[in-house]
C-alpha cells in the first residue's frame, strides 16, 4: 500500500523513531503530556499500553518537550518498596534508570532528543488492597516541573509501511533467546538487537 503524499514511508532506517513516536503519541492521548498519567491498577494483558509489562507493577508515565526547557522530576521516598524512573528518548535509548528518591533534572542534551518519556514503575502487592492504596499515594507524590509547556509535534509516519516493518522485525525476534543488548544507552545496545527491540520490547 502506497503512502499518502504527506506521509513518510517507514523502513528499517527510521523504524525506531517512528515506533517510539507512536508510543509517545499514545501516552499523550492518554493524558500524559507535560504531566504524569498514573495507572492505578495493574496492567490488563489484553489492553496494556506497552508490549511488555509487569503484573506486580503500577505504571506512571509522562512525555515532555525538551525544546521548551529542562524538566525536574521528583521521586518520593518509597522506603523498602521498589520504585524506578526510566528515561526513554525518541530513539528508544534509555540514558538513565534511577532507583533513589530525590530531584533530577533532564534537558535535551542529556536525553539526546526533543521528546522524552519518563516511565515510573512502583511495586504493589496485587493481592493486598492496602498495599495498592499505599502505592497509589506514592504515585501522587511523583512531581514534574517545567517552566513552560511545549508542543507535541511528530512526523506523519505511514502506518502501513510501519506495520509491515514491525511484522518483519517481530519475525526476526522469534529466534532470539533473550533481550540482551536490546535496551539501554546507545553505547550499551547492539544496533541490530536495538532495532528488533523497538518492535518487540515496548
Which residues does each predicted region cover?
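A compositional/structural signature for long, glycine/proline-rich flexible linkers
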Residues: 2-202
Amino acid at each position: 500500500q502506497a503512502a499518502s503524499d504527506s506521509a513518510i514511508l517507514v523502513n528499517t532506517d527510521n523504524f525506531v523513531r517512528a515506533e517510539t513516536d507512536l508510543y509517545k503519541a499514545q501516552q499523550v492521548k492518554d493524558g500524559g503530556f507535560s504531566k504524569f498519567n498514573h495507572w492505578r491498577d495493574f496492567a490488563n494483558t489484553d489492553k496494556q499500553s506497552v508490549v511488555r509489562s509487569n503484573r506486580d507493577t503500577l505504571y506512571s508515565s509522562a512525555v515532555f518537550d525538551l525544546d521548551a526547557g529542562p524538566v525536574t522530576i521528583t521521586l518520593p521516598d518509597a522506603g523498602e518498596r521498589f520504585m524506578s524512573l526510566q528515561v526513554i528518548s525518541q530513539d528508544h535509548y534509555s540514558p538513565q534508570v534511577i532507583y533513589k528518591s530525590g530531584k533530577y533534572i533532564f534537558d535535551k542534551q542529556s536525553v539526546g532528543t526533543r521528546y522524552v518519556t519518563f516511565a515510573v514503575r512502583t511495586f504493589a502487592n496485587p493481592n493486598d488492597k492496602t498495599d495498592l492504596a499505599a502505592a497509589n499515594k506514592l504515585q501522587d507524590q511523583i512531581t514534574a516541573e517545567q517552566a513552560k509547556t511545549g508542543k507535541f509535534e511528530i512526523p506523519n509516519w505511514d502506518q502501513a509501511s510501519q506495520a509491515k516493518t514491525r511484522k518483519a522485525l517481530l519475525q526476526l525476534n522469534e529466534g532470539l533467546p533473550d533481550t540482551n543488548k536490546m535496551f539501554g544507552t546507545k553505547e550499551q545496545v547492539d544496533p541490530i538487537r536495538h532495532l528488533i527491540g523497538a518492535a518487540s520490547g515496548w
